[in-house]
Amino acid sequence: MKIVADQNIPALSDLLSGAGTLSYFSERIPPQKLLAEADALLVRSVTQVDEVLLEQAPELKFVASATIGTEHINLQALEERGIGFAHAPGANAQSVGEYVLCAVLNWLSDQPRYVADEIDVAIVGAGHTGKAAGKRLEALGLNVHYYDPPLCKKGVKFVHDHWQRVLTADIISCHVPLTRDGDFPTQHLFENTALQSLHSQQLLINASRGAVIDNNALLERVEQGERPSLVLDVWENEPEVLSGLVPYVDIATPHIAGHSLEGKVGGAVMISNALLEHFGKPADKTLSDVLPGKAWNERDAGGLNSLESLNLWAKEHYDLFRDDELFRQQGLTTEGFDSLRRNYRKESPRREFINQVVTCHNSEQYIQFLQLGFSARLLSK
């Protein structure tokens, strides 16, 4: 079996050892020579698997994407050709949740005074990443609600479909797939009218897909002044970035919210097992089989009993502003944007907060830090 894979999907040589011949590609589109003989193709969201690509891959039997989204895959074309498909929903959810947590901690630290349960948070999209973000913000004591009309239509109880409630929230965090049709399209969900309604006391976060927010309309809005605080990890038309928008964004990053080591390796494990299963081979690899050991670091909860101390500790383990600085320096060209994603923290991979242990003195602390995504240890009395 000949397997063609994006070179930035980690651990494949270990996960697929003995499964076949593994060849890598480094650009967005695999070389025609590799496609011509490929039995399986493993991609990231930067590769468009469309009719043009599939015409070059007559032997292809299986495609997988190491991502949660599928908008870069022509699923109908795969089905018509009898080509199997898999992706990795939820693999990077904890990583995205931590990105949002760090962004919100930073924003809250700049608020002169606030009462936690009076901060209204709208999570737009109640899938894996939305729930991971929401759980962490609930652990801060914030008032979190979930906007998800498709789930609401199905009768799911913990979501709502009140758009105005979203637009009036103090914090809005986007976690939806990019859809262009159907009953609830998300492309330009935040268009001119919605963006004009936002004000300077709000925080808008997008860690889903760039085109969920109309970037040109957003630029028009922020140029008017009294803008909301902005955290953008994704950009419409990326790797091209609307450069005029960047100076108005408080935290700007190159689509790396989900790029923790655990998130990337987790996606690789999911699609590798799916590939092996598709071809009738044993598929029993786990994250612990290929992930480096945890970098344990212990901290007493008593030293984390304020927002300031928690924010500072979170920054020690994931400093958003390091990624923001590199993006502003290098990410405003298509080549620079792709390079930042491709080479993201290669020398010192970003590890998730679960590697950090918080020693807790009561059950309330224990539950809170587990919800925040840390490991926790409850001292016995």
UniProtKB/Swiss-Prot annotation:
Belongs to the D-isomer specific 2-hydroxyacid dehydrogenase family. PdxB subfamily. The active site is at R209, E238, H255. NAD(+) binds at D148, A207, S208, R209, D233, G258. It comes from the Bacteria. PANTHER family: 2-HYDROXYACID DEHYDROGENASE-RELATED (PTHR10996). CDD domains: ErythrP_dh. Pathway: Cofactor biosynthesis; pyridoxine 5'-phosphate biosynthesis; pyridoxine 5'-phosphate from D-erythrose 4-phosphate: step 2/5. This is Erythronate-4-phosphate dehydrogenase. Homodimer. Substrate binds at S45, T67. It is found in: Cytoplasm. It comes from Idiomarina loihiensis (strain ATCC BAA-735 / DSM 15497 / L2-TR). Pfam families: 2-Hacid_dh, 2-Hacid_dh_C, DUF3410.
